Curated annotation (Swiss-Prot):
It is linked to Geleophysic dysplasia 1: An autosomal recessive disorder characterized by severe short stature, short hands and feet, joint limitations, and skin thickening. Radiologic features include delayed bone age, cone-shaped epiphyses, shortened long tubular bones, and ovoid vertebral bodies. Affected individuals have characteristic facial features including a 'happy' face with full cheeks, shortened nose, hypertelorism, long and flat philtrum, and thin upper lip. This is ADAMTS-like protein 2. The keyword Secreted applies. There is a significant increase in total and active TGFB1 in the culture medium as well as nuclear localization of phosphorylated SMAD2 in fibroblasts from individuals with geleophysic dysplasia. Changing P147L: In GPHYSD1; leads to the reduced secretion of the mutated protein.
Length: 951
């Protein structure tokens, strides 16, 4: 009894142990494996557990980041179970992936998409091979909603194919880079891990908060620009997210050079083609319209970081004022304190002194306190503001008006944008001395010292350094800087310089009635409180003069000079041209009187009229929308058919880039999806004649024969008009007599005497080397394709050639072959008579053959052309018959075309349709470059750009 109980306990213990062990292998998160049957107490059930992982597969790429995978299988076993929780299924994934071979590929090699397209070069399509290449450039974001579709096109652009891209193909997934895995674009995080969603912040730090860098933006505008090269800005080493954009379309050309003056592109008065350049350790993308008729802007962008300083140059070709913006991001050194927001300006003498800090006229912190002279080190810009100290800036008074406005913002936030409608004003004014108002307040004595205005800046620049001349010229270059932390309103509206003469009365010629040190008004500001009034007194050797600087313009106490009566002023910006994504705001010059009243433009000098200023403006995010192609022709030429059109979800993803996206986006936006099919009704077909295709011409070369086709009525034969019955036969001419048989070399022998065969290929070719069907050559003279081989001497035996084609194209037929009695004599094949081989042993020369069932294509007559001039379309019905029944078994490879273009006489020239306008925001220039005018969407969105030249 005790022994039986002890044995039973051990049995239960082992069973429970097995169940517990089964539970412990159930791990993982998600599962794509089969589920188990439910377990019932005390019944047979299936236990599941994972097997071992297989070895990692070979990497899908040799470089550039491929994919490798490994699998495991869910194992199962039937066994007795007890009530309670058990191992009901294998949980977790049965396949996992990881990146491999992530090192960069050689820059001069083919891309992975190119390799995949080239692999189709050996494939035969419609009887011939093609040279394939990717349809879109590698750096072009795919317009398809399926980024892991491989789009290839032939070199001549006549054919296209689309197949799933191989695993490891790079793809774009929102703001993450991705890689194709099993036809789906999977993300790669900034940590380099597949399926990771870690992203870079604006400073290029993985999972950073954007606080470790400074964002620098600026505008470059220069009036009365001289011809040749000028420096736009200097970009220090370590910069990332670089963007230089010419905002105003002109003949100017952007160029890029290093600090030593070596040009990477567009240097030495030569224009390079827009493309990607490997510069300073990063890829610099340079783009511009190829001619003046193209839309788009010229720009330079680079992801960075750069490993050396770069100088951005502009080649001015017509002397007009350029308008260029630049921006980049710099990492902040760990020990650097964040710079206080400052406003300051530069002054440069007629001798073109360098921008090394000695020419600083002063700066005003946001809290109103006054500091001494500062160098550009406070900005963390590598001790330089706009260029290398050794470069000739050419910023003298003769250069006219120039503004370099720079926004520097730490923390990765967006800058408020360039000043709106204001800037440095340079005008010539002849007037009388200005006197101060009683409300002018004197400031601290340090404000009158070099701590705010240096002696060079005021005495030398304004008064001529020791001269008591009463005529002087003020024509300064102002560089306004604004940084993060600036108050929402302008800190220093304008500094106006007035002059009081204490040594008797006398008029002064003031060439430039005021100088704006800062005219920046922060965009979208709700408050515009000016900087508190300040003034200062300066004593110079030019006499006992008092110079007051204040922030409010003072009313003139005497008459206004004619030269100062009227001036040009930029209007306020017009509304943004785009309601979503990025648009353009424009400001235009208007003529105003000295008191600010707008007058007719004829009062101002037309030669000094400023050009309009165009700036980008950001709108809200564009909503997805449904786009439809045009309706197709009716599927039938008579009776009831269907019309179809393509319906896709599109969204403006970025300025100039309108792309198809997943339909889920439009559905989530609750946009009503347009219908894709509708019924179309044509006049009733009625009885009509239908014809099969013409038979093959059997005439020999130089001879004539007849080809035939079957004619049938779509209904009862009596109902079709016999007068319109198509002809059922016509004459044909055999091929030219230049066809000749061509043979290849003999292949190896397959065996010994009596069994050995050697084979060669026999072709029928034209005089220019094209291979044509054998029926076009004389079959009586066709060389043998099979010879006996083996020993040097071999007795006579039967040798059969290859079977000829079946004598019918469908159903039951007969095929033939040539059977010869041959021997080998001294290694040479010779033909012998049949009895020497034994007629009873002769292989058959004919055999029954079967082709596909006798389905046959029939077509109706062609319809009228859809147009009376130009290029139209004509159609016909195509049906498959087996006897009198319409079936689906016909060979699709030989199906007759049911739609054909009809090219008639040219249409009369018509004036351009002014209503045909390109959709705003669509990059039509890019659509033309990549041959997308034939695409249904771009033909509509870019209808003006895609018009034929004669229209």
């Amino acid at each position: 009894m005790d022994g039986r109980w002890q044995c039973s306990c051990w049995a239960w213990f082992l069973l429970v142990l097995a169940v517990v062990a089964g539970d412990t292998v159930s791990t993982g998160s998600t599962d794509n494996s089969p589920t188990s049957n439910s377990l019932e107490g005390g019944t047979d059930a299936t236990a599941f557990w994972w097997g071992e992982w297989t070895k990692w597969t070979a990497c899908s790429r040799s470089c550039g980041g491929g994919v490798t995978s490994q699998e495991r299988h869910c194992l199962q076993q039937r066994r007795k179970s007890v009530p309670g929780p058990g191992n009901r299924t294998c949980t977790g994934t049965s396949k996992r992936y990881q990146l491999c071979r992530v090192q960069e590929c050689p820059p001069d090699g083919r891309s992975f998409r190119e390799e995949q397209c080239v692999s189709f070069n050996s494939h035969v399509y419609n009887g011939r091979t093609h040279q394939w290449k990717p349809l879109y450039p590698d750096d072009y974001v795919h317009i398809s909603s399926k980024p892991c579709d491989l789009h290839c096109t032939t070199v001549d652009g006549q054919r296209q194919l689309m197949v799933p891209a191989r695993d490891g193909t790079s793809c774009k997934l929102t703001d993450l880079r991705g890689v194709c895995v099993s036809g789906k674009c999977e993300p790669i995080g900034c940590d380099g891990v597949l399926f990771s969603t870690h992203t870079l912040d604006k400073c290029g730090i993985c999972q950073g908060d954007g606080s470790s860098c400074t964002h620098v933006t600026g505008n470059y505008r220069k009036g009365n620009a001289h011809l040749g090269y000028s420096l736009v800005t200097h970009i220090p080493a370590g910069a990332r997210d670089i963007q230089i954009v010419e905002r105003k379309k002109s003949a100017d050309v952007l160029a890029l050079a290093d600090e030593a003056g070596y040009y990477f592109f567009n240097g030495n008065y030569k224009v390079d083609s827009p493309k990607n350049f490997n510069i300073a350790g990063t890829v610099v993308k340079y783009r511009r319209p190829m001619d003046v008729y193209e839309t788009g802007i010229e720009y330079i962008v680079a992801q960075g970081p750069t490993n050396q300083g770069l100088n951005v140059m502009v080649w001015n070709q017509n002397g007009k004022s350029p308008s260029i913006t630049f921006e980049y991001t710099l990492l902040q050194p760990p020990h650097e304190s964040r710079p206080q927001p400052i406003y300051y300006g530069f002054s440069e003498s007629a001798e073109s002194q360098g921008l090394d800090g000695a020419g600083l006229m002063g700066f005003v912190p946001h809290n109103g306190s006054l500091y001494g002279q500062a160098s550009s080190e406070r900005l963390g810009l590598d001790n330089r503001l706009f260029g290398h100290p050794g470069l000739d800036m050419e910023l003298g008074p003769s250069q006219g008006q120039e503004t370099n406005e720079v926004c520097e913002q730490a923390g990765g936030g967006a800058c408020e944008g360039p000043p709106r409608g204001k800037g440095f004003r340079d005008r010539n004014v002849t007037g009388t001395p200005l006197t101060g108002d009683k409300d002018d307040e004197e400031v601290d004595t340090h404000f009158a010292s070099q701590e705010f205005f240096s002696a060079n800046a005021i005495s030398d620049q304004l008064l001529g350094a020791g001269s008591d001349l009463k005529d002087f010229t003020l024509n300064e270059t102002v560089n306004s800087i604004f940084a993060q932390g600036a108050p929402r309103s302008s800190l220093a509206e304008s500094f106006f310089v007035d002059y009081e003469e204490n040594e008797g009365a006398g008029p002064y010629l003031l060439n430039g009635s005021y100088l704006e040190l800062s005219s920046d008004r922060v965009a979208n500001s709700s408050s515009e409180a000016p900087f508190p009034n300040v003034s200062t007194s300066l004593l110079t050797s030019a006499g006992n003069r008092t110079h007051k600087a204040r922030t409010r313009p003072k009313a003139r106490k005497q008459g206004v000079s004619p030269a100062d009566m009227y001036r040009w002023k930029l209007s306020s910006h017009e509304p943004c041209s785009a309601t979503c994504t990025t648009g353009v705001m424009s400001a235009y010059a208007m003529c105003v009187r000295y008191d600010g009243v707008e007058v007719d433009d004829s009062y101002c000098d037309a030669l000094t009229r400023p050009e309009p200023v165009h700036e980008f403006c950001a709108g809200r995010e564009c909503q997805p929308r449904w786009e439809t192609s045009s309706w197709s022709e009716c599927s039938r030429t008579c009776g009831e058919g269907y019309q179809f059109r393509v319906v896709r979800c599109w969204k403006m993803l970025s300025p100039g880039f309108d792309s198809s996206v997943y339909s889920d986006l439009c559905e989530a936006a609750e946009a009503v999806r347009p219908e894709e099919r509708k019924t179309c009704r044509n006049p009733a077909c009625g009885p009509q004649w239908e014809m099969s295709e013409w038979s093959e011409c059997t005439a020999k070369c130089g001879e004539r024969s007849v080809v035939t086709r079957d004619i049938r009525c779509s209904e009862d034969e009596k109902l079709c008009d016999p007068n319109t019955r198509p002809v059922g036969e016509k004459n044909c001419t055999g091929p030219p007599c230049d066809r000749q048989w061509t043979v290849s070399d003999w292949g190896p022998c397959s065996g010994s005497c009596g069994q050995g065969r050697t084979i060669r290929h026999v072709y029928c070719k034209t005089s220019d080397g094209r291979v044509v069907p054998e029926s076009q050559c004389q079959m009586e003279t066709k060389p043998l394709a099979i010879h006996p081989c083996g020993d040097k001497n071999c007795p006579a035996h039967w040798l059969a050639q290859d079977w000829e084609r079946c004598n019918t194209t469908c159903g039951r037929g007969v095929k033939k072959r040539l059977v010869l009695c041959m021997e080998l004599a001294n290694g040479k094949p010779q033909t012998r008579s049949g009895p020497e081989c034994g007629l009873a042993k002769k292989p058959p020369e004919e055999s029954t053959c079967f082709e596909r069932p006798c389905f046959k294509w029939y077509t109706s007559p062609w319809s009228e052309c859809t147009k009376t001039c130009g290029v139209g379309v004509r159609m016909r019905d195509v049906k498959c018959y087996q006897g009198t029944d319409i079936v689906r078994g016909c060979d699709p490879l030989v199906k007759p075309v049911g739609r054909q273009a009809c090219d008639l006489q040219p249409c009369p020239t018509e004036p351009p349709d002014d209503s045909c306008q390109d959709q705003p925001g669509t990059n039509c220039a890019l659509a033309i470059k990549v041959n997308l005018c034939g695409h249904w969407y771009y033909s509509k969105a870019c209808c003006r750009s895609c018009r034929p030249p004669h229209s």
